[in-house]
Design a protein with these regions (language model features):
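Structural motif
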Residues: 7, 102-103
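Short glycine/serine/threonine-rich phosphate/pyrophosphate-binding segments
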Residues: 17-21, 110-117, 175
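Conserved nucleotide-sugar phosphate-binding/catalytic loop shared by glycosyltransferases and other
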Residues: 38-84, 91
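Short, well-structured alpha-helical segments in soluble
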Residues: 89-100
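Active-site-proximal region of nucleotide-activated glycan assembly enzymes
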Residues: 124-179
């Protein structure tokens, strides 16, 4: 019997996030060793919020990083923090509900990072045998801190870390910030 695929969704919103998520996306879309290891196959969905979006630049960025084109584009565009975050919340929720991944991966500290993590953290489904489940949330670049409360990104980082189940750190300093 074939194991159920592990459904992974990677949500990106800005150019720096593509670079942070690129190694993971390439690993998940590369040759599978699921048969040899006994691990389930992976079903990947890449969602681009369009937070910082220029068609030619985004396409070039995906190509330069050897990434597949995004499966979903929310086309949010630039704008004030509240408007942009609100649009991402509104547009990402139905995508998450339809795709229903086992794991949502977010990267960095932009409004997309926080908004997508918040949607997943609030999305629960009742299990057939009882109990509840939501997608696990993994945060790439967890623990990064500027210690500048006037930076919107600092708020996004701290809140995303608090919402996440898996904190993917990049340095000993980041680990220390999470302890």
């Amino acid at each position: 019997m074939q194991p159920q695929p592990l459904k992974v969704m990677v949500a990106v919103g800005a150019r720096p996030n593509y670079m942070k998520a690129a190694p993971l996306i390439r690993a998940l879309t590369g040759p599978s060793t699921a048969v040899e290891t006994g691990r389930p196959p992976i079903e990947l969905t890449v969602t681009h919020t369009g937070q910082h979006y220029e068609d030619g630049l985004s396409r070039t960025q995906f190509e330069e990083l050897s990434l597949p084109a995004a499966d979903v584009n929310l086309n949010v565009g630039s704008g004030p923090h509240g408007r942009q975050t609100g649009l991402i919340l509104q547009r990402f929720e139905p995508v998450l509900e339809e795709q229903w991944p086992d794991v949502l991966v977010v990267a960095g500290d932009v409004n997309s990072t926080l908004a997508c993590a918040l949607v997943a953290a609030k999305s629960w489904r009742r299990l057939p045998g009882g109990g509840w489940k939501r997608p696990r949330i993994a945060h790439i670049e967890a623990g990064l801190r500027s210690f500048d409360p006037t930076m919107p990104e600092e708020t996004n980082r701290r809140l995303t870390d608090a919402l996440s189940d898996d904190l993917l750190i990049h340095s000993p300093e980041a680990r220390g910030n999470l302890l």
